[in-house]
């Protein structure tokens, strides 16, 4: 796998889960001899929702809710076959979305 790069993008609602998962990926990649760049924190996406409190009247009384999506980006430069196998066997928490691209 010469001159290749693995780009890993993590998304989660809980920043503690995403930081823990990023640390596991970095440790696994470094243990197999690959060079890791990152994790780079990307901007947090915030979605806000306004919900009416009352089912009938009082339009001015509302609740405001928000969902925060945290993101991290990592590059693994010159991965070996051991690196790819170790990353495939890695068990990450259920709340973390992982996107892997080979470049």
Curated annotation (Swiss-Prot):
SMART domains in alphabetical order: Ribosomal_S10
A GO biological-process term: translation
Signal peptide: none
Keywords of the record: Ribonucleoprotein, Ribosomal protein
Any GO MF annotation of the entry: tRNA binding
SUPFAM superfamilies to which the protein is assigned, alphabetical: Ribosomal protein S10
Highest taxon above the source species: Bacteria
Pfam families: Ribosomal_S10
GO cellular component terms given for this protein: ribonucleoprotein complex; ribosome
Annotated InterPro entries: Ribosomal_uS10, Ribosomal_uS10_CS, Ribosomal_uS10_dom, Ribosomal_uS10_dom_sf
Quaternary context: Part of the 30S ribosomal subunit.
HAMAP family in the record: Ribosomal_uS10
Functional note: Involved in the binding of tRNA to the ribosomes.
Family: Belongs to the universal ribosomal protein uS10 family.
Name of the protein in its database record: Small ribosomal subunit protein uS10
């Amino acid at each position: 796998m010469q001159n290749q790069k693995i780009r890993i993008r993590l998304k989660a609602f809980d920043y503690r889960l995403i930081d823990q998962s990023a640390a596991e990926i970095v440790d696994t990649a470094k243990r197999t001899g690959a060079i890791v760049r990152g994790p780079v924190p990307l901007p947090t996406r915030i979605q806000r929702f306004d919900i009416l409190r009352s089912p009938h009247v009082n339009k001015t009384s509302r609740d405001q809710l928000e969902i925060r999506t945290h993101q991290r980006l990592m590059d693994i430069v010159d991965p070996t076959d051991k690196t790819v196998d170790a990353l495939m066997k890695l068990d990450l928490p259920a709340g973390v979305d992982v996107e892997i691209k080979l470049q």
